[in-house]
Amino acid sequence: MGITHELDIFLVSEDIAMKHVELHKGNSYGCVLNIKSSCRKQMKIIFVLKPDWTEIDSIKPIQMEADGIYIDVTIIKQSFYEVIYCSNFTIYGDSVINIFSDIDRCTKEKYPIININIDKKKYEIIESGYTYIYIQSPIDKEDKLTYMRDDYVDEYNSSDDDCIDYYDCDYDDDDNNDAEDEDEE
């Protein structure tokens, strides 16, 4: 029958979901994202892998490169049914992001290629490869509730000392009196 994993990729920072990024059959998953941006951009990607355990004992880790530089991908939740990964990184203009589980060239050629223009808020599948990929934007509410919950994000952010969560900061017009702001609450 063959191995059939399921991989969904959520580009949280751009509210784009790429569904079924796995190969039709085989123990491999990944894609190429051509990101077009005119400025520096903080990116957050969540990967949801639902492994097919019928013929394998372990799953291959998801790896990622942005313009040839390795990017950390961290497991934030793991169960028998799914493995959820997260990655936060910054791009500085146009970038090519390779997401993969295999490094051999033959397998990588089967991965889909997606263009995402951040400035114009447009995306398109250039090559679907050997997948049934489709794109949703915005990310549907069920996926947001299931995979983008605060406890996942907090757990990931707390494990990364270099990551600053700007949403937790108290910014207001008179930024000099944060202690007074806490007293008023």
From Swiss-Prot:
| GO BP, one annotated term | viral process
Please give the InterPro entries that the UniProt record associates with this protein: Poxvirus_C7/F8A
Question: Which Pfam families did the record assign?
Answer: Pox_C7_F8A (PF03287)
Highest taxon of the lineage: Viruses
Keyword list, A-Z: Early protein
Q: Which family does it belong to?
A: Belongs to the poxviridae C7 protein family.
Give the function comment from the record: Plays a role for multiplication of the virus in different cell types.
Query: Which named protein is this?
Result: Probable host range protein 2
Source organism of this protein record: Swinepox virus (strain Kasza) (SWPV)
